Amino acid sequence: MPAQIDKASSFQALHAAPGSFVIPNPWDGGSARILEALGYRALATSSGASAGTLGRRDGKISRDEALAHCELIVASTDLPVSADLENGFGSTTADVAETYRLAAE
C-alpha cells in the first residue's frame, strides 16, 4: 500500500494535469476495490453514503463514525481518497482542526 504522502502527491498530480477526471464515491470497502479495478485514479468518500451504510440520513453521523468510514475506504484501496467531512464536525476552529488532524492519521 502506498504511503500517505505518495497518495497525496498522486492526488495533487491529478488536479494539476490538463483536463478533468472523475472521482466516484464508494460506499464500502468492496465498492472501493471495484472502482479501483475499473480504472478510476482517485476516490472520494460521501457523507451520504457513509450515513446510508448505517441506515441514517446524510448529516446524521458522528465524527467518529465518519472517520471510521473513511478509514475503511482508505484501507481498501491503493488510490488517493478525498474525504467528505461535512462541516468538520465542530462549531469551533479547534474542533474542526482536530477532525482534520484525526483524519490525517
Segments from the language model and where they lie:
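Conserved, mostly hydrophobic/aromatic
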Residues: D28, L35, I73, D84, ...
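Alpha-helical scaffolding segments of alpha/beta enzyme cores, especially the outer helices
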Residues: A68-L72, E98-E105
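Hydrophobic faces of well-ordered beta-strands that scaffold small-molecule active sites
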Residues: V22-D28, L43-T45, V81-L85
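Catalytic cores of alpha/beta
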Residues: S31-A37, F89-R101
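Alpha-helix-loop-beta-strand connector modules within alpha/beta enzyme cores
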Residues: D6-S10, A17, R56-A83
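Glycine-rich, proline-tolerant flexible connector loops at the mouths of alpha/beta enzymes
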Residues: A42-L67, N87-T92
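N-terminal amphipathic alpha-helix/helix-capping segment at the start of soluble metabolic enzymes
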Residues: M1-N25, G29-L38
